[in-house]
Amino acid sequence: MIIATKSILIKGLETVDVDVEVTLTSRGIPRFDIVGLASKSVEESKLRIKSAFANANLNFPNKKIVVNLAPADLQKTGSCFDLPIAIGLYCATNSIEVPKDWIFYGELSLNGELRYTNGVFLLCLFAKERGYKKVFIPASSTNEVSRFNKSDMQVFGVNNLSELIGYLKSGDDQVFSQSIVDEAAESSVEPVERYTFSNIIGQENAKRALEISAAGGHNLLFYGPPGSGKTYLAKSIAEILPDLEESESIEVSKIYSSVGLLKNSNEYTKTRPFRNPHHTTSYVSMVGGGNPPVPGEITLAHRGILFLDEINEFPKRTLEALRQPLEDKFINISRLNNSYRFPSSFTLLAGCNPCPCGYLGTNRCGCSPKVVKRYTEKLSGPILDRIDMHVHIDQVEIARLADFRNFNDSNIDQIKKNVLSAREIQRSRYKGINQISTNSDLGFEEVKLFSNIKPEALQILKKATSKIQISNRSFFKIVKVSRTISDLAGEHQIGESSVLEALQYRILTLDPQYNY
């Protein structure tokens, strides 16, 4: 008798239906074989399953066991096949048919308990799309899938193998009374250090740049002396970012579930990601990789912020790898037998000093021109060209800082409203256009359709850009930033003031000769 249970294989962020076929025979020497291009981690499931059976007081069949993971031409990796193999083995031993609309997923420990397993969100999404009625996952993974409606599909959180076997025998849902996923049981987000505009004294120009960046998804570079507030400013953008939309939330949850970052909370189902990798981060950690490939920081920042503090300190190879994701909003990772595409539609925020010591242009700077040149060259022209806005940060006057006890910035609520309003305008404008949700996503054809720039404003743009050396890409980035500024002001057309403001974010550069 052949028993087949259902499971999935996760390839990057894609899911593949897997049939777990189990057969027992009394002929030949008793042994346990797994076929279907099983990796080392899948082969090791044999020992985990034997131990789990023993600890659940189940008789392990003293027969020749063959498990086939179909389709057999795909490499199977991970420990998620423990549960479907164990259930198939038990049902084959006891001649129990498993309904075809049930799906199993999870890793077994030696004592029969189910461990947290990456990718449960992708499993439930797959199961819902394919019409599965019952999904069995580790109880420790249920917080990831609180959004799924039980009327469409029942999701059972299983604590141990004995519990699931009891359900197979009785069919009583009360076996899982403590672990059936409840939509109201979302885990709370642990409090994190709060960065807020209300604590920033001065820096109005930088705050305005952050407002524009949040409203239109524009990349932003802060540069200036150390201690001027570049890092705090960048981290404060999280306060004014709008929550994820439903479709964006699903995209982000898939990514974070695949790497196990939804284990302790499901904050990423609503909050936009904010990734802040250290400058020692490796190339693979940044762009993704490994075998099998896993998402890197640029994918973990999808639909959110990637903040590179001290961007000049990152290896040049790592920075150059950002070219394609910044332009195409995805990254391709190729392997011998396959190619993986990970989404990477993020907003880049970066901070840097003008020189190694940070005090270029003052008496405190001891850096030679050669040292400064070598330092600034780490940020190549193509990377700088892909950053929409360049903002110089000055030190705030000490006299103003000394009055910190009387400082009170009440503009934050208005800034949030402005950002939400501008996002709503863009959502309505680009409704039905694939892969475009903000002004920063616009391609050449969309800029022609939606820029709606006044003739007077266009003349100012032509005159200004003829005097400064900019690329074609920079020209259109100025137009897109102008479009966002007009959206923040509630203006249907791009006016002169919007163009003039956008221009100021492109004129300043990391020129070693610039007098800071």
Predicted regions and their residues:
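Residues immediately C-terminal
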Residues: 110, 306-307, 313-314
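Walker A/P-loop
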Residues: 221-263, 328
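The Walker A (P-loop) glycine that initiates the GxxxxGKT/S ATP-binding motif of P-loop NTPases
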Residues: 224, 288, 310
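Walker B catalytic acidic pair
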Residues: 303, 309-310, 321
